[in-house]
Amino acid sequence: FYFGVGLKNYRNEVRKKKYENTEYIDTKKRFTTHPHQVHYEFLSETGITGYFTFIIFIFSSLFLAIKSYLKTNNLYQLSGIIFVLTSILPIIPSGSFFSTYSSSIFWINFAIMCGYLRKN
């Protein structure tokens, strides 16, 4: 609960007998490699400690970037801010955050968003 099952270990944990639902007929189809939602993935793999650390890191970075954007009106920074915000919306399903192409794009946009903080 506090520390999760470890990065990319969701697929191993979900196959354990203790999570098996005997009322569900096709139990083989319940196995998946990741939770398909970034918040659930962080909670299950890094626990409540890792989740809150991630959220604080992202939102404090967003706060600084928005504050910087309001001073400079840099459109590159704005595009990074918008991408990061839409990527962490809880209503949007996502691929595995730790091992997909989309997570690479997320971190590139995060770097663009934060890269213009030094210019102020």
Regions found by a protein language model. Give the residues of each.
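Transmembrane alpha-helices of multi-pass inner-membrane enzymes
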Residues: 57, 80-92, 96-120
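Hydrophobic transmembrane alpha-helices and their immediate junctions
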Residues: 45-88
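Short glycine-rich loop/turn motifs that provide flexible caps or phosphate-binding loops at active sites
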Residues: 3-5, 46-49, 93, 110
